[in-house]
């Protein structure tokens, strides 16, 4: 299960190298709580806001994409500021962090059920690669899986490849730096040279 956690974020279930499910929907707005995006909400919420607040589609779109998530919960749009406020004990941010972590753990749990188990968790992107605190809070919620975090390695890992679980941990956890540009370039090349999407899937 990959946890791509940055300003935007997604959780993805991968089995035998193939994506089984992802928290994103038609757009990256769906899924977990993000820096300024709301993540999954009741589909009626935007309609209710438009009706009761007399807002336009564009205004609600801006609210859901740029004024929600951790920013809406705690008042900070930058994850580093949000984390610092959490460590200071700001009540709104402490509650916001609980909501944020819960949304991530909920998707991980759902994907474990969908795949019938999990071998490894991967943390990547800005927060996933650099925040030992967020990784620790997530993994602590998953300790029932037999995950044993290596706190020393976890705290020291910032943007580098590392295994952050102890030797013998039943489920392993890794930090793996992302390279979205390279993946886009490779997929574009495959799309250009493959006769059909099915051929592209086999090539990967």
Predicted feature residues:
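Hydrophobic alpha-helical segments, chiefly the membrane-spanning helices
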Residues: 203-204
């Amino acid at each position: 299960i990959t946890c791509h956690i940055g300003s935007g974020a997604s959780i993805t279930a991968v089995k035998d190298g193939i994506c089984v499910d992802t928290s994103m929907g038609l757009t990256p707005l769906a899924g977990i709580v993000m820096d300024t995006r709301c993540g999954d909400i009741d589909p009626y919420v935007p309609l209710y806001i438009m009706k009761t607040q007399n807002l336009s589609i564009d205004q609600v779109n801006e609210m859901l994409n740029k004024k929600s998530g951790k920013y809406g919960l705690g008042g900070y749009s930058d994850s580093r500021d949000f984390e610092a406020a959490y460590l200071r004990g700001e009540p709104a941010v402490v509650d916001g962090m609980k909501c944020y972590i819960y949304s991530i753990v909920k998707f991980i749990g759902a994907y474990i059920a969908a795949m019938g188990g999990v071998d490894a968790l991967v943390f990547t992107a800005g927060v996933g690669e650099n925040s030992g605190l967020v990784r620790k809070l997530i993994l602590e919620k998953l300790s029932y899986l037999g995950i044993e975090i290596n706190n020393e390695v976890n705290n020291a890992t910032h943007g580098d490849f590392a295994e952050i679980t102890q030797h013998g941990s039943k489920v392993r956890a890794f930090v793996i730096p992302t390279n979205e540009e390279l993946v886009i370039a490779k997929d574009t090349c495959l799309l250009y040279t493959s006769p059909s999407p099915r051929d592209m899937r086999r090539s990967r």
